[in-house]
Amino acid sequence: MLSLYRYDSFNAMTFDLDASVVKDQAKAFGADLVGVVSAKTLNEFPPDPKWPQTPERISTHTKSVIVIAKRIPAGAFRAKSNIPVQYMDMLVLRQMDKAAYRLTEWLELEGHPSFVTAAQETDWSYKNASYGRLSTRHLGIEAGLGTFGLEVNILTPEFGPRIYLTGILTEAVIEADQRITEQVCIGESCSRCLYSCPSDAVRHFGIDKRACATEAQEFGFTTILQYWEHFIRQDADTMRALLRDREMFGFWQGLLRVVGSFGDCPRCLAVCPVGNDYHAHLADIQKVIPEKTPEKVEKAKGFKTARKNNEPIDGLNDWNARWVGPDGYQGMVARQLQAFKKEQREKEEAASAAASED
C-alpha cells in the first residue's frame, strides 16, 4: 500500500501518500506539470480576502490540493486568428479534466476521498461572477509551478503562460511543494504582453477584466445579453434579419464548440518569451508586435519608473507580492534561453556526427 501513517512516534507529521508517486501518477494520466499545496496554506492566503476563494468554503475535509497543468501546443499561436487557439484550448481542457478525473479515481482507490472543481467556471455569488470558487492561477503559484506575469497570468518556467490548470481537492495529507520566490516574469523592462494587448487591458501586475473580455470573449455572456437586449426592441423584419446575422451564428458555434465564447485572446500568451516552447516555435513569428504603440511604450516606462521609485502599486502590495515573486526577477528567462541554445547546439552536433558516420 502507498498510504503512510499520519504521525510517527514523536508526533511529527508524516504523509498519507508519497508526493513523488502522486506526481508520477498524474503525469501518467496526462498532466504536463504537477504541484501540491496544503489546504491550510490556501485558506490562510486567499487571493482576495473580501471574496475568499478557498478550499474550506468548498469542503472542510480537504487537506491537500494537487494542481495539474496541461500545456497549449505552440502551433496554435502561429495562426492568423484566435479561432485555432480557442478550439485547441477546448481540447486541452478536455484532456486536463480527464487527467484530473483519473487521478481522483486513483486517489479514492488508495482510500482518500477526492474531487475536482470546475476550473473554468465562475460563481455568480463571487463578485458578480468575476471569480470562480478557486483561482487556478493562485493554486499553481502556491504549488510551486510559477509566478504571476505583468498581465497576471501564471508564468511557468517550462511553458510560460501557455497552460491551463485545475485542482484536485483531496483528504490525503501530501507533502507540499515550495513556492517559487524568484519572479519568473521579466517584468516592466519586457512589457511584451502590454504592447500586444488589443484592448490595452494590461495594468501593473493587474488586468482590466472588462477591457480584456471585449477581445477574449467575442461571443461571451455579456455580448449575448447585449445582443438580446437590442433584439427585443426591434420590429419583426429586423428581428428576422438579426436571427440570420454573424453574431447569432457565433453564439451557436460557441454553444457547440466554445469557439468565440471561450475566454481567451491569445496575444499576451503568444508573445511572452518565457518557456522553451517560445524559443523553439514562437520567437521567430512573434518577434515583432504589430499592436505596439508609442502610448503603450510610455505606459511601460511609467510602470518601470514607479517600481524603481518604490511607489505604491496595487499589484505589488504586501499581499499580492507573494504571487509575483518577492525576490524579484533574477534572470531566469536569460538562463533558460542559454540552456535551450546549448541543448540545440548539442543536438545539431550529435546529428552531424551521426550523419558523418553514415
Map each language-model feature to its residues:
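Long, compositionally biased charged/polar accessory segments in the mid-to-C-terminal portions
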Residues: 311-348
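Charge-rich, acidic-biased intrinsically disordered regions
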Residues: 224, 298-300
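Short conserved micro-motifs at the rims of enzyme active sites and ligand-binding pockets
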Residues: 77-79, 224, 282-285, 355-358
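Compact disulfide-stabilized, cysteine-rich extracellular microdomains and processed peptide cores
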Residues: 285-286, 290-297, 342-351, 357-358
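FAD-binding beta-loop-beta segment adjacent to the flavin cofactor pocket
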Residues: 55, 302-303
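Non-catalytic, usually N-terminal nucleic-acid engagement modules in DNA/RNA processing proteins
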Residues: 2-96
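Short, C-terminally biased terminal segments at protein or domain edges
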Residues: 290-298, 306-315
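Catalytic cores of enzyme domains
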Residues: 85-86, 91-293
